[in-house]
């Protein structure tokens, strides 16, 4: 795996835009491939073309309404960017919320595609066939999200795709730039709990797991919050830790130590919840960041609209025709005032619309507040990315993923900022203060502290609180008069690991 941090950008283009593709009319295609300049191509390691789907034959497929010649033209334009960056990978992404969520239009196909060995083989082969036919460099699966009953089949499907990709890499002589396999992973504990007990098995065949560490707040919640807070704010909301119910088979002491509850729903929490599981290498974890904001109406002004009740509809799609986000032209076009691209937010802030840009130094995120109209917008910008980039480096993560390329401003300032923070020789963040925001404090098998202790001696009777080293870990007795071996019963708690 490359030592360069991954910078993975989704390129989202719906079927109607593919079929009418043009690079000269932004009213038809708001973000054509030509907007990805050579400079931007050099700043990226991956572009994830989105989305393909799984059809009723349980094969990876384009939307049946897609004009194939037009689709090939768009993909060819993307792959041509590799002339400016030979190490750039153009992946294709299967799924997305619309297709794959529990109520998604194709959800049953995702379930059935991993249900039996025959179905998995058919699906895996179709993924590689699409990859080869259209000239992609790998497969990204964005199933949001497998239920517990589907996880074993999902793992088996990933393993089968991995095997085929490895074989294809050798067959095509691509050992210098192998075909890759990635997935989009849950950024919140509720969805993560579906597959958390088998997280290491899911990650094993992957090159990266791209955490969707955004949409952590939205109109479905009763109060406003930051959608991608790096750290927690004691003034903000907390949530029940659903990972306590992830069928891990741990003792109550282990569960409460690993999964404090309630807790702040943050980027840091999601990352640490992955790192605490054994078999999940930090270099495979990719932090997701949003290139868009989430807006709320009907907020109060005591705290700049933060942590306020609101009157924002939570239905999907947006049920009304009241486009209340002042200055948001995209909202009228897309018929939804609750989402605005960074490009649009920048224009709203620069215009004379009454917005204030404010900063929360606990969460390390900006937000917009419109006092007169009672509006609150949570988003990220180049300043918040400084802290997230430093965190990625501190935690030795694989890199960053963002949704999506078309939401940056025309100059690509957000992408350029990420590239600078990771790669610029003259950029130094050693003095950047990460602040005092609330950190996730859970401790599990993968992030136990390094400790030392006397070796366990069989036949010894140990008092309550005694520490011993055994089979690479440090163990502590929960009560006294213990004669059993560490890990053989509930009398011992694993508290550390040996160097």
UniProtKB/Swiss-Prot annotation:
<dbReference type="InterPro" id="IPR003610">
    <property type="entry name" value="CBM5/12"/>
</dbReference>
<keyword id="KW-0146">Chitin degradation</keyword>
<feature type="binding site">
    <location>
        <position position="145"/>
    </location>
    <ligand>
        <name>chitin</name>
    </ligand>
</feature>
<feature type="binding site">
    <location>
        <begin position="212"/>
        <end position="215"/>
    </location>
    <ligand>
        <name>chitin</name>
    </ligand>
</feature>
<protein>
    <recommendedName>
        <fullName>Chitinase B</fullName>
        <ecNumber>3.2.1.14</ecNumber>
    </recommendedName>
</protein>
<dbReference type="GO" id="GO:0030246">
    <property type="term" value="F:carbohydrate binding"/>
</dbReference>
<dbReference type="GO" id="GO:0006032">
    <property type="term" value="P:chitin catabolic process"/>
</dbReference>
<dbReference type="GO" id="GO:0000272">
    <property type="term" value="P:polysaccharide catabolic process"/>
</dbReference>
<dbReference type="InterPro" id="IPR001579">
    <property type="entry name" value="Glyco_hydro_18_chit_AS"/>
</dbReference>
<dbReference type="Pfam" id="PF00704">
    <property type="entry name" value="Glyco_hydro_18"/>
</dbReference>
<dbReference type="InterPro" id="IPR001223">
    <property type="entry name" value="Glyco_hydro18_cat"/>
</dbReference>
<feature type="binding site">
    <location>
        <begin position="95"/>
        <end position="98"/>
    </location>
    <ligand>
        <name>chitin</name>
    </ligand>
</feature>
<feature type="binding site">
    <location>
        <begin position="68"/>
        <end position="69"/>
    </location>
    <ligand>
        <name>chitin</name>
    </ligand>
</feature>
<feature type="signal peptide">
    <location>
        <begin position="1"/>
        <end position="41"/>
    </location>
</feature>
<dbReference type="InterPro" id="IPR029070">
    <property type="entry name" value="Chitinase_insertion_sf"/>
</dbReference>
<comment type="similarity">
    <text>Belongs to the glycosyl hydrolase 18 family. Chitinase class II subfamily.</text>
</comment>
<feature type="active site" description="Proton donor">
    <location>
        <position position="144"/>
    </location>
</feature>
<feature type="binding site">
    <location>
        <position position="403"/>
    </location>
    <ligand>
        <name>chitin</name>
    </ligand>
</feature>
<dbReference type="GO" id="GO:0008843">
    <property type="term" value="F:endochitinase activity"/>
</dbReference>
<keyword id="KW-0119">Carbohydrate metabolism</keyword>
<keyword id="KW-0732">Signal</keyword>
<dbReference type="InterPro" id="IPR017853">
    <property type="entry name" value="Glycoside_hydrolase_SF"/>
</dbReference>
<dbReference type="InterPro" id="IPR011583">
    <property type="entry name" value="Chitinase_II/V-like_cat"/>
</dbReference>
<dbReference type="InterPro" id="IPR036573">
    <property type="entry name" value="CBM_sf_5/12"/>
</dbReference>
<keyword id="KW-0326">Glycosidase</keyword>
<dbReference type="GO" id="GO:0005576">
    <property type="term" value="C:extracellular region"/>
</dbReference>
<keyword id="KW-0624">Polysaccharide degradation</keyword>
<dbReference type="GO" id="GO:0008061">
    <property type="term" value="F:chitin binding"/>
</dbReference>
<feature type="domain" description="GH18">
    <location>
        <begin position="42"/>
        <end position="425"/>
    </location>
</feature>
<dbReference type="InterPro" id="IPR050314">
    <property type="entry name" value="Glycosyl_Hydrlase_18"/>
</dbReference>
<feature type="domain" description="Chitin-binding type-3">
    <location>
        <begin position="438"/>
        <end position="498"/>
    </location>
</feature>
<keyword id="KW-0378">Hydrolase</keyword>
